[in-house]
Regions:
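N-terminal membrane-anchoring alpha-helices
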Residues: 1-53
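Catalytic core of membrane glycerolipid acyltransferases/transacylases, capturing the structured
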Residues: 18-35, 47, 61-119
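Soluble or luminal CAZymes and related metallo-dependent hydrolases
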Residues: 32-36, 121, 216, 220
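Generic preference for hydrophobic
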Residues: 54, 68, 91, 201-203
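Thr-Gly-centered strand-to-loop micro-motif
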Residues: 55, 92-94, 116, 143, ...
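A short beta-turn/loop motif at secondary-structure boundaries
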Residues: 58-62, 193-194
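Non-catalytic C-terminal accessory region of glycerolipid acyltransferases
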Residues: 124-244
Length: 244
């Protein structure tokens, strides 16, 4: 974990510059900041000696916006998705993140924060997500609503509605994203106990929202949940077989 901190401090001036420039209509600032953040994560994983293995069942089209929906069991999830998700994107995160020194400032500038206990904050964040998608920038969201699963890899059921409502409204595809084993590498509640294991990520085929209405949101939500659940179950079954 020390590698993440030291490399972040080294690259923070570049991230900060990109964050400042990202307020303009020119995408240069966003590209600069995202490039620095990806470099940070990529180098940190190299220093940790931990490879990331991505199963590209689908390769996102450059310049196209998607809503990426991933399971969320570990604080490692943000670092991993920050490296593997291509293009320009915005995370949806809790407002508490901005209290973190330096990282919180960067996160608030580049991403979208929401106070889930506040209807006003949820409405504002949803509107900001709509504008982000309309500008051709993807959204990365953890539709469980945080790290709330008590028994990973069993996810919280059901997913929250926001991701699916915004995808339908903007007619943007949903891409289910399975973070297969982060909960074993960095278990929630044990932030400084990293277990070495190659990181496994699966980009599933996109689910089209073309022609869908809000009446289809529940079906879309269920379909996304089952795709991720199936992949997690395959991993669990494989581990059980391997240990016999």
């Amino acid at each position: 974990m020390l590698a993440f901190v030291l490399l972040f401090l080294l690259l923070f001036p570049v991230i900060l510059l990109g964050s400042w420039l990202s307020d303009s209509k020119n995408k240069f600032g966003l590209q600069l900041a995202h490039g620095a953040v990806r470099t940070w994560g990529f180098l940190a994983f190299i220093f940790m000696g931990m490879p990331i293995r991505v199963d590209w069942q689908f390769r996102p089209e450059p310049g196209k916006a998607y809503v990426y929906c991933a399971n969320h069991f570990s604080y490692f999830d943000i670092a991993v998705t920050g490296v593997v998700v291509p293009g320009l994107y915005a995370f949806i995160g809790k407002t508490g993140v901005k209290k973190l020194p330096l990282f919180g400032y960067m996160y608030a500038k580049l991403h979208i924060l929401v106070d889930r206990s506040s209807p006003q904050s949820r409405a504002y964040s949803l509107g900001k997500c709509m504008r982000t998608l309309a500008q051709g920038r993807s959204i990365v969201i953890f539709p469980e609503g945080g790290i709330k699963a008590h028994n990973p890899p069993e996810m919280v059921y059901p997913f929250k509605d926001g991701a699916f409502s915004m995808a339908i409204q903007q007619q943007v595809p949903i891409v289910p994203l399975t973070l297969v084993n982060n909960y074993r590498i960095l278990p929630d509640g044990k932030p400084f106990r990293v277990h070495w294991e190659p990181v496994q990520v699966v980009f599933h085929e996109p689910i089209s929202t073309a022609g869908l209405t809000q009446a289809d949101a529940n079906t879309l939500r269920e379909q996304t949940y089952r795709i991720i659940e199936s992949e997690l179950n395959k991993y669990t079954a494989h581990r059980s077989t391997s240990s016999v």
